[in-house]
Structures are given as C-alpha cells and as structure tokens.
Amino acid sequence: KLSSKKSDAFRVDHIGFLFQQFNLIPYLNLIEHVLLPCRFSKLRYQNAGNTESSLKDEACRLLNLLGLEPDKFSHLATQKLSVGQQQRVAAARALIGNPKLILADEPTSALDPENRLAFLRLIFRECLKNQTTLIMVSHDTSLSAQFDQVINLGVLYRVNEP
C-alpha cells in the first residue's frame, strides 16, 4: 500500500484529470494553467520538455491544437473565456507531460455538437501518440460509437446486484 504522499506523487505523475467543472484557478493565465501538473510532477515536467522555454512551447502546441491561440487569449482572465474555451484549457492541462492515464468526466458537455467530435478526435490523437489510456464518463450515448470499449454502468450495477 502506498503512503498518502506516494499516492499523491503517483497520481500527479501518471494521471491527467479533465474535470466536468474544469477547476481553473482565476489568477493563472492560460499557459500557467496548462503547466500546472508540471509544477507538481518532475516526471511530467521532463516529459513536457524539461526546460522552461520548451515547457511553454509544449503548452502553446497543445493550446493551438485545441483551437486556442495563446497570443490571442493569454491576456484574458479565465473567467472571461467561454465555457468551451475553459474546457479546452483544462484538456491541455490534462494532456501535458504525457500521463499514462486520463480520467475525463463529461469532457464534451460544454461543447456544441460540431465541436464535440473534433475535440474528441484531438484528444484521441494525442492519447494514441503518447500511449495514454483515456477513461471517459459521459451521459451522451451518441459518443459511444467513437470508443473501442463502452461500459454501461446501469447494466454493470444490475449484474452486481445480489
């Protein structure tokens, strides 16, 4: 069993989180948000570039990939971004440093149908490139066709009933 400290270190080193509510910190800019996991994890810091300038380049690459030009948006407070833009900042934060697992809770809920599939394809492409496993929770059953494996928790619960 891991100690609390080692458990925290394992989580930050190996798991990227994409929360439904984004959990963006109001006083951080876009780049600072994306780089946050690298401030807590030496492994993700090394994977993302290992120098401040290469870290910033990787953060900018992810933001650009997700349709947020850092030069255009970096001056805005996170509260001034649209909900969809905030969600993309949170996605870049989850992806930085190549975690082995990304846990995503309703990551497409704030996106319109046009952007939903494009967003997922970008996440899938980055996960495939970095050999990252994506576990996503969603109530949107129309997205199930995009995944290799789908588990219906309602069915799962019934199977486990005594």
Place the predicted regions along the sequence by residue:
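Conserved catalytic motifs of ABC-family nucleotide-binding domains
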Residues: 98
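Conserved ABC ATPase "signature" region
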Residues: 49-72
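Short coil-to-helix segment of the ABC ATPase nucleotide-binding domain corresponding to the Q-loop/switch region
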Residues: 28-37
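Hydrophobic anchor residue at the start of the ABC signature
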Residues: 91
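Conserved ABC ATPase signature
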Residues: 77-81, 85
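Catalytic Walker B motif of ABC-type/P-loop ATPase nucleotide-binding domains
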Residues: 102-105
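ABC-family nucleotide-binding domains
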Residues: 112
